[in-house]
Amino acid sequence: NNIIKELTDESFELVDRPQCLERICQNIEHFIATSGVDRDKILGVGVSIVGRVNPETGRSYKYFTSWEEPLRDIISSRIGIRVMLENDTRARCFAEYTTGKSQKESNVIYLHMGRGVAIGIVIDGKLYYGKNGFAGEFGHIPFFDNEIICACGKKGCLETEVSGIAVEDKIVQL
């Protein structure tokens, strides 16, 4: 529960290219170098990424999917430190559970409404992944009777009306 340093790279755009992966690794290296912590004492690095993620295999199903190795293993081999990969909303949920206002609770639901819509779930002090590992990805549930095609390819998903992207689109149309 001791935050040593924070780093935000607001100019960063996550895309599925080698240059993007290199930037991620450079940001991690810069963070470690300027943290004031001896590199040998770092047990691991947590990386959260938007979209579907399998933390057990270390794979992202949205970014860097064409690479043979899991994203977690690629980053780990480049920086020389063990890496844990997690979905961004689940990571935020767990951070809220362990260090935020929900510390005294054993069950937490964290709603994230950004460019997409998702929830993170903690049950009995553990992140909940569901049967297929994607619990909380409810932004792509058909919810509206509209003809708006979602990023996932379906029509009428919750994200087509209430996500950050949907709100931006509505403002542009005004």
What are these regions (language model features)?
Residues E6-E10, V15-C20, R78-T89, A95-L174:
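Glycine/GP-enriched mid-protein hinge/lid loop-to-helix segment characteristic of carbohydrate kinases
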Residues I4-N107:
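Glycine-rich phosphate-binding loop and adjoining helix at the ATP-binding site
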